[in-house]
Amino acid sequence: MPVSTALHQDGSQERPRSLVSTTSSSGSSRDSHSAMEEPTGSEASAQNGTGSPWDRHVPNSNNNSSGWLNMKGPLSPFNGRAGTSPAYHKLSYLGRVVREIVETERMYVQDLRSIVEDYLLKIIDTPGLLKPEQVSALFGNIESIYALNSQLLRDLDSCNSDPVAVASCFVERSQEFDIYTQYCNNYPNSVAALTECMQDKQQAKFFRDRQELLQHSLPLGSYLLKPVQRVLKYHLLLQEIAKHFDEEEDGFEVVEDAIDTMTCVAWYINDMKRRHEHAVRLQEIQSLLINWKGPDLTTYGELVLEATFRVHRVRNDRTFFLFDKILLITKKRGDHFVYKGHIPCSSLMLIESTRDSLCFTVTHYKHSKQQYSIQAKTVEEKRSWTHHIKRLILENHHATIPQKAKEAILEMDSYYPSRYRCSPERMKKAWSSQDEVSSHVRQGRRQSEPGHTLFSRATLPSRQQGFEMPGLKGRRKSEPTRHLLRQLSEKARAVGMKHAGSAGALLDFGQPAHAQKQQPEAERAAREELEEEEELVEEEEQRQQSFSGSLEGLAGHDGSEKVPGPELPGSEEEEEEEESLAVAEQGKRHRESEGSKGCRRPSNRSPTSAEKRMSFESVSSLPEVETDPEPGAEQEAFAALEGPSTEEMPSDPEFPEALETQLHAPKGLLGVDNPAAVVDFVEPEGSEDLKPLSSEEEEEEEMEAAQEPESLLPPSVLDQASVIAERFASSFSRRSSLAIEDGKSSGLGTPRLISRSSSVLSLEGSDKGLARWSSIGDSLSNPPTPEVIIGADMVTDNGPSVNGTESPSAGSGCPTEQDRSSCKKKESALSTRDRQLLDKIKNYYENAEHHDAGFSIRRRESLSYIPKGLVRSSVSRFNSLPKPDSEPAAPVGYKRPGSSRPASWTLFDLPGPRTDKGDPAPITDAEFCPSSEIAKIWERMESSERSPRTGSGQSQANGFELQEPLFILEEHELGAITEESAVASPESASPTEQPSPAHLARELKELVKELSSSVQGELVTPLHPRIVQLSHVMDSHVSERVKNKVYQLARQYSLRIKNIKAARPPLQWEKVTPDQEEQVPSISGLPEEAGELSGGKARRKPVLSLLSYEQLVAQEHGTSKSSAAVETSPRRFSFSPSAVSPRTTSPGARSSARSPLSPFDTETFNWPDVRELCSKYTSHDKTAQVESSWPRSLLVNRSRSLPENIVEPPMSGKADRCCGLNTHRRLGDGEASQPPLPESPPQSQLNGGDALYVTADLTLENNQRVIIMEKGPHPSSTVGLEEDSGKESSSPVALKGQGQGFQASAEYQPKEHGPRDSADTNKQGRVRNLREKFQALNSVG
């Protein structure tokens, strides 16, 4: 055979070589084109050897690999090689297709082995020949591909020619094919590296010697192209299986899943390479642009199109560059471009001319003078530009336009190329239009292709919209509209034939006569199937009153299919508009497809006026679907709709033709030469191969189906995702190392970005998709290593896809990552020799990384770099992964091991939204004990306070002389301060560095609220870093730590109490010198902010202004110095030996730390038990007692409820001092808490014989009764009582006759006191005034 002779002329092979691996590669290497330029026909055609007479491809020296897949007969490619085997002829056609897939895979794996063993390993074994960077650039992750395909071949061999089993092999390894994306991405680097090597004499000699020694007829460059060619053919080979597979048999869905998977891979590689080339071109444009004053062009997104047009009323042509965000207008001057203007896409308006099919106008809709009337060179060029301008107008519009509405608008355009739209239906359309229709056609048809059969899964549209429709697996969803199509079929056919020969085609692929002969048969089969389906359709239509598909349904199915069954939201409102759209679009597509059937018109015939009218009959209804665009927005959003826009081109691949076009089109598949040429490469009928490559949208839509069915990501969103990925990548190296330091063995400490590979499998059944996602989640929850590469779309998460997530040096495809849940095949799938080869390569790269840390980064970038805008699936994946600006791991319920501060907390400085100024990123509730545990601690402390007390000093000397007079501190506040003190002890911090207790109490009260909310799964607001540091304290020994800190805090306050106290006016029996009287300030000027705490509720409290407070402190210091009794005063609170030492913290510093007017929420207020006080009274000298206790009393005392045992009990040897202290302190407590009532005569006498005179009585809101009494040797004294709780007094002189009062609980009063005596009128009047003031303040508070 001719091919066999050509392949074996060097005698180097004893087997026939696949055409894809030889001639096509040879041609491509001879032409020095990119890998994506000249992929040739299907592998199986290698055996055909001769060009098929019905091959309709661009003339090429390698196009002898004709479309054998499309034929049954003597020209079948299987006859060439397999014809020598009689058993091979006995196989059915389907069996021969399966056998051919396996055999070509075997040849391909042998070629890969030759690259790895005969070239790569020899270079590694030759020291000094090439640097590791050159080796990495030259071979990429070829070893990973070899590992993957070796395992795949082993699986295929075990299938025993079972087509379902063969298809399942591809489905099971769907994720692993991402390594091909990396290889193709690196291929330009490989070509450049090989070119550089051939310029070096020594290296060139090495490669020539190797080729001669191996007796290869092809150079290394041809072998390096094979992976690119092979991966682009898998979906076509699998389509041939589906084409001849009975859809009623079990396993048909598996075949379709495999087609979906490999089509996604092919499309993704195609789009990735196109974007990569555009990114390179963008940098080139940036360097050549003159007079541009704006930012770097990369900030405007991806370069979409570029072309030079003739502009009306402008002498010289203008070169236009269309980016994702702006339209740049320049004038070419030599090799440079002179900036002439630009229009933001958000302000861009498109006006299509109906008179001239080549003209259209772009203008700034706010500045009509900035207008450019452009004349394209061809109709196809105009279609391309107008389509992309429309798309960018919608995507950049200020108003929020529903995605489905955008898609519906765009799908009305005749130019809807697959390389820019990755709708799943677009991909399926490529499979649905086949020139040859088998007898086993599917029940469902594309609405846009009534005469074709559909070879895509019936359930895919349902999954794409987020729900599975159980009753529609056998039929397409577009069936309800088929009856409409029949009415248009004949007219559409006539229109299509009329324009079949229109001129102006960019790529005119003629229809061979042999292919035309096959069409009548195909049409007859389709019509027979149509008759059968119409019966089912009529039954279904009777159950439906209207079409259930809406614009949302249109988006997923070429904008034309209706979705019977459950309606998507909003579908009823737009029912009529959608129906009219469906009819118009259906008729248009039907005309185009029927025209191609009848006369195979040229690829880019211009649309007819009828088509224009049909496509725009229902345009006016579209704005109703929009979400209220702003004024001018409607014009902007839909300006692009004015002009001819026949519905999208039906590029339906005929398998052999599509394969050849796909692999031979010089600028169509991967666009290496010219970005503009890549974009302009459009063929309504001839580029059938491009449709199969448009399936990435299906991946992302299915991945987002659970949240937003059929959500398509515009480039603007994709660009944002790429920014996120870049930021994530930049911070992840630090994060991963810190995560290791934290010792996170489970959870998301080292999250891996999920690659686009999972999008490959997302095309499968929804139940399979869910299973895949669960496996992905498992792999994420147990990441084996912290290595992350932001690859093609994201980093691959799969195991054997080796170089996807691991350093390519690790033998990427090397199945050594056995701990990955997505790794379906283990290392055992490879032979021992293969494992040794891969291990050697892996060790080589690891050794290079060890010597040069930058090598690892550069290698990964070369394999995983994707231009901005290509991160397709990343947006939906980021929603389920930790954000770079939050704590990297900490899942809910997960607690960090150990009590030390994890190093990963340093990541709090990452940028991100802050809900509270100065606060870090939110912290999960896992870092704190539940609020219930904290509450239990306080309850235990409170219960200990309620227990019987052994000494009054122990329970009563707990907070009446605290120097902080600006707020009432309750138990929960004290506990909060205690937690804070665990981080920074107030005794060791300077006044300026530590916040006031009030501030800490406020922060930690907020923490309690946040903890209570976080128990339910969500943290309300981020916390202060110092509060975050309390997490490890709360994790262990919470009770002990809290109690110890409470004691420490009490000592701290005791220290301040003894050094800073406010002066209190002496009572009448106290010996006050005239000097002391002068120093006692009047409290009449003290501001009253609010009433005192009452009934366990938060009440506003009396406060001192900062100025008065400082004055009182100064006066108190002066008084204490002149008083002889001061020497013994500090020891009455002997909490600890250190309590005697003076504190350096000034009251001014404490007061300035918090505004005195800041109220606090308080909890229950525990009143002391007066019975204990009474039992402690003993007889002693009153005068000495007063002198020893009162001179340093607080001027303003407030009641505080503190846990019991917070202070040390007083020494037993100082009983009378404690008794006197408690008496006086309780007096201060009562005076501070409540105002006096009218005076009452004495009712009881204590142990010491001292008479107590009731001076006031008040019942609180909680039914507690407060009695204020005077005690002293002068019961006849009628001097008015003056309180020291901040209430007004006429002068300090009036205080001299006051008796000492104290407070009694409601339980004690009835037992201890009888009826009260009446007081004199004057005194009652004064007391009544004070009481009224107090009650008024209580009501206000």
Swiss-Prot record:
The modification Phosphoserine is found at residues 76, 433, 502, 571, 694-695, 737, 759, 762, 766, 862, 899-900, 947, 1129, 1134, 1136, 1141, 1155, 1158, 1201. Residues 529-541, 570-580, 695-707 have a biased composition (Acidic residues). Disulfide bonds: none annotated. InterPro entries: DBL_dom_sf (IPR035899), DH_dom (IPR000219), PH-like_dom_sf (IPR011993), PH_domain (IPR001849), PH_PLEKHG1_G2_G3 (IPR043324), SOS1_NGEF_PH (IPR055251). GO terms for biological process: regulation of cell migration; regulation of establishment of cell polarity. It is found in: Cytoplasm, Cytoskeleton. Residues 42-51, 59-68, 798-810, 949-958, 1135-1162 have a biased composition (Polar residues). Keywords: Cytoplasm, Cytoskeleton, Phosphoprotein. Residues 817-832, 939-948, 1309-1320 have a biased composition (Basic and acidic residues). GO terms for molecular function: actin binding; guanyl-nucleotide exchange factor activity. Residues 18-29 have a biased composition (Low complexity). Residues 93-272 form the DH domain. This is Pleckstrin homology domain-containing family G member 3.
